[in-house]
């Protein structure tokens, strides 16, 4: 019992809601001296705040729980949940094992977060073991657990197990349907995902977002936008950040600037919070759609305090891709002044900028800075350095750089070197690199074409023809390139030699007229002399 002289003060301390860990440390120390550190509601509040709060410390929660003379069951669930959301989800499994050693039985609130940890760890074996434990504990048809299991199997790309569980469930709710839809979408099976989507009698924003994201991840961007349009027409669900990021991504890949602007206006009209992720997506979309001014406008309006490395990367990379090389490098220095730490992608953007601008000295500086920052250069960083050197005509240096790399050269590295050799007239090295490329990627049509071009430039026409013969022998077919033009909201696709475009007669007529004005002796009806459209 509390002493009457201090009961009011003690009760006040026990009920105090902490707002920071430093405050919690002080109160905990005080209660230890008073012998009240295991009293409620301090125990439950301490475990809840330290394990689940964004400003908490789940390791502290675990230590606190372990030292209690009679740790409550809910405390174990709090700590397991906290670790499942942390940078160390494997610790939740350790807590679970210790819980079992104490003879405590997991309940319907324990398993879902253990399954979340197994998903984050990509541990299929662990997930299967947890499922077996659920069955043994008699919780196999708990709706919360079943929905989490479907989501877990989906994260493992195991649609079969997810579907089997879905079909066997005696009761389903909207979360169940969303879970199986997301499982199919994550695995890239958008056909099955769409069948589930069409079968659903009820949909919410998660449903629509999963279907849209599934199409985006499969590269079916037009279908993603069609689903979004359907969502808007039905009006039953308001799009959220996840929805809009996927929609913006689709616009970016399609180069659909007008559509992207419409989406941006929608975000503003419905007062959707312009989070860092949304702003970064908009910057990336505008840059990829050729409107660097709009990209800059989005970035400029953002408060520096609300930015992160990803947003700075998007605008730095966007400026560089549009030829604003010096501006992108200056912005990097501004980024450092703003106390935003660059990451590996930042240096990749900077190296790409140096490549476009022919800035060899600066590229070496950034490449060395990346190493000095403690990060290990990835394949993409090495590829950028090869591109920088090759574009600048330093093809021998690029070749030496590749030879001294601690990783094996990729097709993109050798491809950049090959282009540099061709552009700067080193045909001997070009032939050597071209042959290595074919060995590395024997089914890539572009590698044969690249070496054929080397032979043609060197007037070795027989060797050039042999490349086509080699392609035919290996069954490699040249994939026709295409261009896309967005005109007044309508997308026009142009492919070599094709005349299926609904205005092809008029287009060819204009080409003939243009050729005549330019005194070009070209027959646009001769497929051997031109590449055209559909």
Swiss-Prot record:
GO biological process entries: RNA modification
Sequence similarity: Belongs to the PPR family. PCMP-E subfamily.
Residues covered by region (Type E(+) motif): 489-519
Protein name: Pentatricopeptide repeat-containing protein At5g08305
Gene name of the record: PCMP-E105
Organism listed in the record: Arabidopsis thaliana (Mouse-ear cress)
UniProt keywords, alphabetically: Repeat
Chain segments carrying region Type E motif: 413-488
InterPro entries (alphabetical): E_motif, Pentatricopeptide_rpt, PPR_At4g14850-like_plant, TPR-like_helical_dom_sf
Repeat positions for PPR: 41-71, 72-106, 107-141, 142-172, 173-203, 204-238, 240-274, 275-305, 308-342, 343-377, 378-408
Repeat listed as a keyword: yes
Top-rank taxon: Eukaryota
Keyword flag Iron: no
